[in-house]
Regions:
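Terminal amphipathic alpha-helical/low-complexity segments used for targeting or macromolecular assembly
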Residues: 1-74
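Short amphipathic alpha-helical segments, especially helix-boundary/capping motifs
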Residues: 17-22, 60-62, 81, 109, ...
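Residues at structural and domain junctions
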Residues: 27-30, 53, 83, 93, ...
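Short linear elements at protein peripheries
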Residues: 56-100, 106
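Left-handed beta-helix
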Residues: 85-86, 90-99, 104-105, 109-111, ...
């Protein structure tokens, strides 16, 4: 859970390493680093959701709109506070994760994956650290 600026920087750094982004690149390249951009927006949304105050609330709604637009563009549905640090999305397209799921750090997820609950229950998957999730 991202509660402070230090936590946000740590999560973003771990995600950047997991995506194998070169350390000398500080910003996502337009049209190329769409997954990295998605993860930055996701982490910023998590940060502002977990903090209180008018400033954080306004930025949460702004980032949530950006996240929903990017989710529709990439066909990825991941809600805030589901993944730990070190998230690596291999390819965009067809990724759906239940908002009640909790997945640990250093997770790599491929396209065509659905992590959900059964029979309409609120209980969802609890997946540990250092996992590789793929279709099949």
């Amino acid at each position: 859970m991202i509660k402070s600026k230090d936590d946000l920087e740590y999560y973003l750094k771990c995600d950047k390493v997991a995506l194998k982004i070169p350390s000398n690149r500080f910003f996502p390249r337009p049209f190329f680093d769409l997954i990295w951009k998605y993860e930055i927006i996701l982490r910023n949304t998590e940060y502002h959701k977990n903090n209180s105050g008018l400033f954080h609330k306004l930025l949460y709604y702004y980032n949530r709109i950006r996240l929903e637009r990017m989710s529709a563009k990439l066909s990825i549905s991941i809600k805030p506070n589901v993944f730990g640090p070190g998230l690596s999305i291999a390819h965009y397209g067809g990724i759906v994760v239940n908002p009640n799921a909790h997945i640990g750090s250093n997770c790599r997820i491929h396209e065509g994956v659905t992590i959900g609950a059964t029979n309409g229950s609120n209980r969802a998957a609890l997946i540990g650290d250092n996992c590789f999730i793929s279709f099949g």
